[in-house]
Amino acid sequence: MEYSDKQIAAQEAVRYIKDGMVIGIGSGSTVNEFLYCLAARMRKERLQVVGIPASKKSERLATELGIPLTTFATYQNVDIAIDGTDEIDDQLYLVKGGGGSLVREKMIDLVAETFIVIASGKKKIKKLGSFPVPVEVVPFGWQATEQRLQQFGCQTNLRMVEEDIFVSDNQNYIIDCDFKEIDDAEALHRSLKQIVGVIETGIFINMVDKAIVADNGELSILEK
């Protein structure tokens, strides 16, 4: 059987899961592969774990696969977080949020003792910016917030689903900001966060402990 790069990265990530762990579950297609692999290992080894999902989509799939779920009300500490990414650079900085779950993903990834990113090789780039930076904003006055975002030299698009405005799991809007190329991701993130109305950006700085990247069947483990 020939596996996709997403499946190869997911299979490697499951090796880091130990019995009794609280797992932060990100979102996206690569994380879906991780959930399939995790469920298979749980059945085979009777592995006992619980997960905290970052999105309703991940929550639904985990439930379908029989993976027990919990919340921060029960566990405030996360042993390991597994998440995908839209872009990752040489510093292991990320642009995430194409699925619209960036706030919850960042909350989980920040509190995790270990944060592992899984990705296919096409997500590995030299400099962030080829993928628009998602910015989650308060719905009230979003037009004014968008105008202030544009002052940073980006092209902006309010995220839509067909004819309707996309609404995040937190009931907010997302403005996708196309910077083309980001020279200083850390400074940009700080500046965007200072805009009133901005809740969070999809730039993830100094958070990743390990990246598992599969490119044309070849596996690479990247660490700082």
From Swiss-Prot:
GO molecular function: ribose-5-phosphate isomerase activity
Binding sites annotated in the UniProt record for substrate: S27, G28, S29, T30, D83, G84, T85, D86, K96, G97, G98, G99, K123
This protein's GO CC annotations: cytosol
CDD domains: RPI_A
Entry keyword annotation includes Isomerase: yes
Catalytic residues (UniProt): E105
Enzyme Commission number, as recorded: 5.3.1.6
Pfam families documented for this protein: Rib_5-P_isom_A
Keywords: Isomerase
Pathway: Carbohydrate degradation; pentose phosphate pathway; D-ribose 5-phosphate from D-ribulose 5-phosphate (non-oxidative stage): step 1/1
SUPFAM superfamilies per UniProt: D-ribose-5-phosphate isomerase (RpiA), lid domain, NagB/RpiA/CoA transferase-like
Enzyme class: isomerase
Membrane spanning stretches: none
Key word Isomerase present: yes
Biological processes, Gene Ontology terms: D-ribose metabolic process; pentose-phosphate shunt, non-oxidative branch
Domain of life per record: Bacteria
Catalytic reaction annotation: aldehydo-D-ribose 5-phosphate = D-ribulose 5-phosphate
InterPro entries listed in its UniProt record: NagB/RpiA_transferase-like, Ribose5P_isomerase_typA_subgr, Ribose5P_isomerase_type_A
Annotated family: Belongs to the ribose 5-phosphate isomerase family.
Subunit structure: Homodimer.
Entry function: Catalyzes the reversible conversion of ribose-5-phosphate to ribulose 5-phosphate.
Name the record gives this protein: Ribose-5-phosphate isomerase A 2
Species this chain originates from: Oceanobacillus iheyensis (strain DSM 14371 / CIP 107618 / JCM 11309 / KCTC 3954 / HTE831)
Lineage per the UniProt record: Bacteria, Bacillati, Bacillota, Bacilli, Bacillales
